[in-house]
Amino acid sequence: MRLRTSISLVLTTMLLIAACGGGGATTRPSTASVAPSTAASTAPSTAPSAEPTDEPTTEPTTEPTTEPTTEPTTEPSASASASDWSVGVVTDVGTVDDKNFNEYSYNGAVAGATDIGAGEVDVAVPADASEYASLIQNFVDTGHNIIVTVGFNLANDTAISALANPDVWYVGVDQAPCIDETGAPDPTFGCAGDLATLLPNFVGLQYAEDQAGYLAGIVAASISENDTVGAIGGINLVPAVVRYLQGYELGAKSVNPDITVVTDYVSTSDFGVAFNDPGAGKDFADLFIETNGPDVLFQVAGKTGNGVLESACAAGIHGIGVDVDQYLSLDAGNNPAYECIVTSAEKHLATSVEATVTAIAAGSQTAGLSFFNAENDGIGISPEGSGAGLITAEIQTLIDDAIAGMIDGSVVTCPETCGTAE
């Protein structure tokens, strides 16, 4: 059976781990993060990195809201006719058609441009991080008035460009820039500047990782045969990673209060090892599995997590991916670990980008951080991957009921210390 689930925070601020996304992919039928079929006009030859963006960040001092409490004093005009809108997308390093962050974000921009009657969406793929700023500026120079930048790595350059170009709207996917009182990126991480006030033309898209993690926990506990499930995060200094794991544990225990949920982090200080080292992830997971004996393992560690899934596959246990449908993204990257992935906890990137582009054109989008969760179809869980038949109708009902509970508030997916590692 194929899992059909549709639901809609990474509260983060700075850059560190690359994320990919793009167009032209064939997506599996699902109400979760369905991507438009429009293909990118160009696809660079660089191999996709196929990693989720669980980047290190500094936690903002206030929770993001869909509508920031501070009204911007000025913002770019949203009264332009459809023909006046021009949308550009700057992806992270990799390819547009990576079945990951770049692809789904790009497809959301294409859908949004179609909704508002704009022309073809232009896309730029950097060869490396040094090109972020110049590619963003190129779109400014060529008259694009909605610029979508994909992933945490572009947060600083996006904020700098937004400050310098108040007549252009910027959509930062999975971004919450830390800015000072002038609106510039704050290297001291004081984050004293208010985004909505100082960057009234910037929208940072954030997601409820705890809700997506909760759904993954439901699946894990439901398919576990030995009542022991595990989760490995990249580092406990990233609130988004911690939220995923906290939600996962609560979701698993909602199915089986007596289940053993073992969680750990690959590193406590080294972000490179935490998110960009598949070998370290595999070695860590090998020992984790040997020591704790889970028969389901959830990864929240970017590229490092790909190694975690490889370890799970080698050990003959089930894997759960993160951020995007990793059954597809790892297969696209020729990583055999995809064969063991039952499902993935998703951020609905295409849905959220499309909604934001459409709202900008309609004049209803406020600046600051926009929060996507179950209520607005911002998060979800992937169709069943390699574990064909594992997700039964009964498990699907548990998932559907949990989504309904998230929407009406009866299901709590994160403790009071949400996002803070104990």
Predicted features along the sequence, with ranges:
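A residue-level marker of the well-folded mature domains of exported/periplasmic proteins
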Residues: 44-51, 55-422
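C-terminal motif of bacterial Sec signal peptides marking the signal peptidase cleavage site
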Residues: 16-19
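Bacterial N-terminal signal peptides that target proteins for export
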Residues: 1-10
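Post-signal peptide N-terminal segment of mature Sec-exported envelope proteins
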Residues: 28-54
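Bacterial signal peptide processing site
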Residues: 21-24
